[in-house]
Amino acid sequence: GADYISIMQANLKALKKTTEQEGTEIAAEKEEDTKTVQNGYFEDSAVKDRTLSDYAGEWQSVYPYLKDGTLDQVFDYKAKLTGKMTAAEYKDYYDKGYKTDISNINITDKTMEFVVDGKSKKYTYKYVGKHTLTYSKGNRGVRFMFEATDADAGEYKYVQFSDHNIAPTKAAHFHIFYGGESQEALFNELENWPTYYPSKLTGQEIAQEMLAH
């Protein structure tokens, strides 16, 4: 815990020199190509279709860890690293981003199960394509889109994943967007991006993952 954090603090100056990005992901220790893609800079030709199996697994929302203070160390670190916002401002920004009532999502290569207040809803999905968004600071992100084949999927009919990858690979964490209106309607959602990490991780382990990226 504390030792890891203090080591990260000691790396602040070095990190500032090696990364110019704006705080959402600190990827200085990644390979150059991966870092570039992770930061949202890539060629259109590099974007490939993906399957639901890239997201298969049991996942937990990080929102409870923001609420109970576990992630405060992450916001403190980001504030010191970037100087763009205070720790409190980062926490408020991520509160809006992480906010969700879906505590867990369990995914197979064909289905998604959403758990809200201990009750689950499970639907079958098909892949329907990918869409690249360009953000205000010039970087980009790819949404991988899935659609429920069940008639009663309601607000879970249209689902999009964003995991900072643009081609087939197993997701380490992801942001999810969902709704009952259309895929296009979800392209406009840039403020709320519920975020999920493997269910087996503790809050402290998730905080360390965030600091290491």
Where are these predicted regions, by residue range?
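Aromatic side chains
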Residues: Y4, Y55, Y125-Y127
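N-terminal helix-cap/turn-to-beta initiation motif at the start of protein domains
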Residues: F42-E58
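Solvent-exposed loop/turn segments at secondary-structure junctions
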Residues: G1-A2, L66, I166
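N-terminal glycine/threonine-rich, aromatic-flanked beta-hairpin/loop signature
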Residues: L71-K126
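Extracytoplasmic metal-acquisition and chelation regions
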Residues: G1-T36
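Calycin-type beta-barrel ligand-binding domains and close structural analogs
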Residues: K30-S45, I107-H213
